[in-house]
A protein has these predicted regions:
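N-proximal low-complexity "stem/linker" segments adjacent to membrane-targeting elements
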Residues: 1-36
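Short loop->beta transition adjacent to catalytic acidic/histidine clusters or analogous donor-positioning motifs
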Residues: 13-15, 36-47, 55, 68-71
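Acidic helix N-cap motif at the loop->helix transition within catalytic regions
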Residues: 27-29, 54-63, 105, 109
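Short, conserved alpha-helix that lines the donor NDP-sugar binding/gating region
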Residues: 32, 57, 61, 81-90, ...
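A conserved acidic beta->alpha catalytic loop
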Residues: 34, 41, 49-58, 77, ...
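Glycine-rich, basic loop-to-helix element that forms the pyrophosphate-binding segment
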Residues: 75-92, 102-105
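Short aromatic/hydrophobic "clamp" motif used to bind/position activated sugar donors
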Residues: 97
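Donor-binding/catalytic cores of nucleotide-activated saccharide
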Residues: 105-219
Length: 222
């Protein structure tokens, strides 16, 4: 797989990965390491620390000091997850937007595989399957809940809504998608800042469905 950059965008990252963070010292290092492990390395990671009162900020700064692709922003007061995501969107410079929450783990080929899908199919969004992992206080896996969508390519909104049951499988999470940044900007798609502690990504994804023309979906769990 070889993805070729347009000369006009050389020097800019292909993908901006946005990570809101709050009091995540226990697991944010694992989330950042999963980004660093990506087989495709033309990315930037923008972390917005929403005034954490634990060691989250220090952990993020330590990673940023070692890798120039990692950028950190810090709020002086807690503003909620939607404001943090919108701020990260404003600072993003990549052709595509991906999300990784502070307790997520990105499979190593998430970016490589889904960049291929979105560009090969001239799509505005790629979406993939995922699983939720339950972990005990001793960091022991105690359960897994997979959410699987079928492979499909949608060429217009009518096709998407006819197959809404499949689309709905992964609609509640922004971190199961790769989004064309120009598409988001053209339609002024951003997060509703009334959501402070969750639910913002479902509304965000529903908003994208009002405008998207081509979308590709993968049954692969990332």
């Amino acid at each position: 797989l070889k993805l070729v950059r347009n000369e006009a965008t050389l020097g800019m990252p292909k993908v901006s990965i946005l990570m809101p963070a709050y009091n995540a010292e226990r697991y944010i290092g694992t989330a950042i390491e999963s980004v660093l492990s990506q087989s495709y390395d033309d990315w930037e990671l923008i972390i917005v620390d929403d005034a954490s009162d634990d060691n989250t900020g220090a952990i993020c700064e330590r990673y940023a000091s070692k890798d120039k692709r990692i950028k950190t922003l810090r709020h002086t007061e807690n503003k909620g997850i939607s404001i943090g995501k919108n701020e990260a969107l404003r600072h993003a410079s990549g052709d595509y937007i991906a999300f990784c929450d502070d307790d997520d783990i990105m499979a190593s080929k998430t970016l490589e595989d889904n960049l291929y899908l979105v560009e090969e199919n001239n799509a505005q969004i790629a979406r993939w399957s995922y699983k939720t992992v339950k972990i005990s206080s001793e960091n022991v896996v105690i359960g897994e809940i997979p959410r699987i969508c079928r492979n499909n390519i949608y060429h217009n909104r009518e096709e998407i809504f006819r197959d809404y049951e499949n689309v709905h499988e992964v609609l509640s999470c922004d971190w199961t998608g790769l989004y064309d940044r120009k598409f988001l900007n053209r339609h002024n798609i951003k997060f509703n800042e009334k959501y402070r502690y969750g639910g913002e990504d479902t509304e965000f994804n529903i908003l994208t469905l009002q405008y998207v023309e081509r979308m590709v979906m993968s049954s692969e769990i990332y």
